């Protein structure tokens, strides 16, 4: 079971991501592109180019979780920014 602290930080990768990436690939994007360190109290959110799939990577103190969502219709709203990340 996942539980989140009241001071949860959410980092959104603004560039589209290859949804075939798993734990290691997403961890690499976080450390190399977003220049962040996956840590407790933070969620890292990724989407594909069509904005129909979502992956969230989080650390619970004992290991990494990858959560996925695929929309059957419609798309996710996504922020735009030149620096490649957003902190919500």
Give the ranges of each region predicted by the language model.
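Polybasic/polar functional segments that serve as interface/processing modules
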Residues: 1-85
